[in-house]
């Protein structure tokens, strides 16, 4: 590959002609081979340039953002991860929450009612009480909704029956299309809960392992890991009610706006991006708690499904009590067990 040609191409894409930018591009290109080795990346000759261009732009974005973080202008750091080479259009395919898929369906949910005079702790983290399975990885399939749904049901099942069982996302990807879900092309957690209720269960992860692609349904009622009796929606946009719900009920499925390069490249800290919407939701994740950072304020603890190498060992802390940042409280629900 002619890296001088690539240098010119990237500069043209960024459309800024400056000595500083040229140095940043050169520095990023020098890190490319190390990145490929560190993350075990292999590309065909025809596709490597595309991924390298994306990597270079992301490296520059990381460097500029982290400079602002060091100056106290940002509350979180960004860094390289296994998806730092993805062009933004490919990255967006990971975000498979499809709110429109549910608009034409009749809702069959219950509404969350907070216990009377309830007092909840200042901090909650359900990872400490064995209600949360290890971080999983959806791969390049837009099945985030399935991971969010299984995560909530895993927690409810463990809370009620005392046993944490990893459940099958592939079962939901393959078998819940009649409920409005579209496998690797997206879906909704509530529709997954409806499928599980009517199907009288979802298989265990061990019996129906994840493949990361749409396949023929082969649910087996003999290997069911958990069931639900329906689901509960929390009040839309109400962070205080969501705080009470996660404190009293356990892990909760939520949808967020993850359609930003800052989210793709998040490394650590309390995530706050002024561009993050409370309505344009595109990614299903699992809320497992909340807390307060002494420097950057209140946050939610959110489990992602992009592997333990992303973010804070697979998790992200999202700003809390900042006008429903990224829509954490807009579409939240949990299954009834």
UniProtKB/Swiss-Prot annotation:
Keyword presence, Disulfide bond: yes
Annotated compartments: Secreted; Cytoplasmic granule; Lysosome; Endosome
Organism for this UniProt entry: Caenorhabditis elegans
Signal sequence coordinates: 1-18
Organ and tissue specificity: Expressed in intestine, pharynx posterior bulb, hypodermis and cuticle (at protein level). Expressed in germ cells, developing oocytes, sheath cells surrounding germ cells and oocytes, and in the eggshell (at protein level).
EC number: 3.4.22.15
One record GO biological process: immune response
Sites carrying sugar chains: 108
Name used for this protein in its record: Cathepsin L-like
Effect of substituting residue 32 to A: Probably causes cpl-1 misfolding resulting in its accumulation within the ER and loss of endolysosome localization
Effect of residue 35 to A: Probably causes cpl-1 misfolding resulting in its accumulation within the ER and loss of endolysosome localization
Disulfide cross-links: 141-184, 175-217, 276-326
Active-site residue numbers: 144, 283, 304
Propeptide residues per the UniProt entry: 19-119
Keyword Cell cycle (UniProt): no
Coiled coil feature spans: none
Matches recorded under PANTHER family: CYSTEINE PROTEASE FAMILY C1-RELATED
Catalytic activity entry: Specificity close to that of papain. As compared to cathepsin B, cathepsin L exhibits higher activity toward protein substrates, but has little activity on Z-Arg-Arg-NHMec, and no peptidyl-dipeptidase activity
Gene3D superfamilies per record: Cysteine proteinases
EC top class named in words: hydrolase
Function of the molecule: Cysteine protease which plays an essential role in the degradation of proteins in lysosomes. During early embryogenesis, maternally required for the proteolytic processing of yolk proteins in platelets, a lysosome-like structure where a slow and controlled degradation of yolk proteins occurs. In the gonad, required for the clearance of apoptotic germ cells in the engulfing cell phagolysosomes. In embryos, required for the degradation of endocytic and autophagic cargos. In embryos, may play a role in the degradation of lipid-containing droplets. Required for larval development.
Predominant place of localization: secreted
PROSITE patterns noted in UniProt: THIOL_PROTEASE_ASN (PS00640), THIOL_PROTEASE_CYS (PS00139), THIOL_PROTEASE_HIS (PS00639)
GO function term, MF aspect, one: cysteine-type endopeptidase activity
Entry keywords, A to Z: Cytoplasmic vesicle, Disulfide bond, Endosome, Glycoprotein, Hydrolase, Lysosome, Protease, Secreted, Signal, Thiol protease, Zymogen
């Amino acid at each position: 590959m002619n890296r001088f040609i690539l240098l010119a191409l990237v500069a043209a894409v960024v459309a800024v002609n400056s000595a500083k930018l040229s140095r940043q591009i050169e520095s990023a290109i020098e890190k490319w081979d190390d990145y490929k080795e560190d993350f075990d990346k292999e590309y065909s000759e025809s596709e490597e340039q595309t991924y390298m261009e994306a990597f270079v732009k992301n490296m520059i974005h990381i460097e500029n953002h982290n400079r602002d973080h060091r100056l106290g202008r940002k509350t979180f750091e960004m860094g390289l991860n296994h998806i730092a080479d993805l062009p933004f259009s490919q990255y967006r395919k990971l975000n498979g929450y499809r709110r429109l898929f549910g608009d034409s369906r009749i809702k069959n949910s219950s509404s969350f009612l907070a216990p009377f005079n309830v007092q909840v702790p200042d901090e909650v983290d359900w990872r400490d009480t064995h209600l949360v399975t290890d971080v999983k990885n959806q791969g390049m399939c837009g099945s985030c909704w399935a991971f969010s749904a299984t995560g909530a049901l895993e927690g409810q099942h463990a809370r009620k029956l005392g046993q944490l069982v990893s459940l099958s996302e592939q079962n939901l990807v393959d078998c819940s299309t009649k409920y409005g879900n579209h496998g690797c092309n997206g879906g909704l957690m509530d529709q997954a809960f409806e499928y599980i209720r009517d199907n009288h269960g979802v298989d265990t992860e061990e019996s129906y392992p994840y493949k990361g692609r749409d396949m023929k349904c082969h649910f087996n009622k003999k290997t069911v890991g958990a069931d639900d009796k329906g689901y509960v929606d929390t009040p839309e946009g109400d962070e205080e009610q969501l705080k009470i719900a996660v404190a009293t009920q356990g892990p909760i499925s939520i949808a967020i706006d993850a359609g930003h390069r800052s989210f793709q490249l998040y490394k650590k800290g309390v995530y706050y991006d002024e561009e993050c919407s409370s309505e344009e939701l595109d990614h299903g994740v699992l809320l497992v708690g909340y807390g307060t950072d002494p420097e950057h304020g209140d946050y939610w603890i959110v489990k992602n499904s992009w592997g333990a190498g992303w973010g804070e060992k697979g998790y992200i802390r999202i700003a809390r009590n900042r006008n429903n940042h990224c829509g954490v409280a807009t579409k939240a629900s949990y299954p009834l067990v």
